Amino acid sequence: LNCVNHISMKKFLSEDSIDYQNYRFGYCVNIILEENDSIEKAFERGYLPYTGNAKNTEEIYYLARSVRINLNRYVRLSENKRVIKKIKSSLNISVDEHKKEKFNHDNKFEKFCIKYSKERFSNESLSDERLQLIIKRENYNKIYEFKSDNNPIGYVITFSNNNIIHYWFSFYDTKYLESIPIGKFMMEHIINSEKKNNKKYIYLVTSYGRDSMYK
């Protein structure tokens, strides 16, 4: 392990076996953000938040190939407009945006997220401990809540400021996959919404493997 200072961010290098599903790469470049370090700059330089070790509460990021959309160039396709309008009307979907500190991360919410992770995560599902770490991280400050007839059907945990938004973790009721692409709907809604809010970029996490191609 080699630790150095790098543009006011602590940087450390490590070697590991290659396991993309668990965010382990042959040669890992990580940083630890401190109180005055810029989260936006970390994303700009290609780093993503790391929570693989639930016992480590430092603000760790890892360097990885990820997807960034320039929202100035983003245009919603007419076919997408049609599909999205149909989904919203058929399920009577509404979307609420909450600041992290105003949202109730209660037991019902936690069970919803962990249930989704057991059904959909390709690697290890979320533990209670790791979910609590995610909630406490500084790179989470805003959550989107998707409802159908006022019943929660999905959540997206994000970091948002005046310039960017990072689409970090999404959770949804998987029964809707039988009829609609609910995950893609949630992502596209946020992309389009943040374009309207004049954000410059949206970061859509990693892009390793076939399962990430839809991004």
Predicted feature residues:
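Conserved GNAT acetyl-CoA-binding A-motif
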Residues: 197-205
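Conserved donor-binding loop and adjoining core beta-sheet/short helix segment
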Residues: 3-37, 42-71, 148, 152-174
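Conserved acetyl-CoA-binding loop-helix of GNAT-fold acetyltransferases
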Residues: 179-191
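A residue-level signal for conserved active-site and pocket-lining positions in enzyme catalytic cores
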Residues: 46, 113, 215
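Conserved active-site alpha-helix within GNAT-family acetyltransferase domains
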Residues: 208-215
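A conserved beta-strand-loop-helix scaffold within acyl/acetyltransferase catalytic domains
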Residues: 91-179
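Acyltransferase donor/substrate-recognition loop-hinge adjacent to the catalytic core
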Residues: 52, 56-120
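Hydrophobic pocket-lining residues that define ligand/cofactor binding sites across diverse proteins
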Residues: 194
